[in-house]
Amino acid sequence: MVRCKVTLSIILLIGLAMPIQAQTNLPSLTASEAHELQQAGELILIDIRQPEEWRETGMAQGAAGVSMMHPEGGQGFLRDVLAAVNGDTDANIALICRTGNRTSQVLPALQRWGFTRAKHIPEGMVGSQFGPGWIPSGLPVQPCAAC
């Protein structure tokens, strides 16, 4: 019984650590780095949260809103991301969500779809163990125009 509990605890700990491990192995930027690159015209920022979240907190200034929960599924999401980058899969893009969890799940799909310079912002809009976040860092936000 004790051995079973220990094994189960180890499996649970490994499972909980996997998202953190996945996030640290992905190409990433801090919120401040992304903001600087975006301001210089060298980065397209894509907010993959849902419209309710955009309304609640606003969006990073200049970000394209493309919800990962697209009503048309993955194909609709891909179509809208392609539209945000004018069809250029070599565009320098960064994905942002609330805390970096969703971007760490979506980024590998974009890489499989041929996006060669895609990155994510692990601290997200509100912060995580990877950093303070876009909003707490005092970076500019704007209301969602399409919400």
Where are these regions (language model features)?
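Bacterial N-terminal signal peptides
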Residues: 5-19
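Rhodanese-like catalytic fold shared by cysteine-dependent sulfurtransferases
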Residues: 3, 19-40, 52-92, 101-147
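Short, surface-exposed ligand- or partner-binding patches at beta-edge/loop junctions that are enriched
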Residues: 95-96
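Structural scaffold elements adjacent to functional motifs in cytosolic proteins
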Residues: 45-47
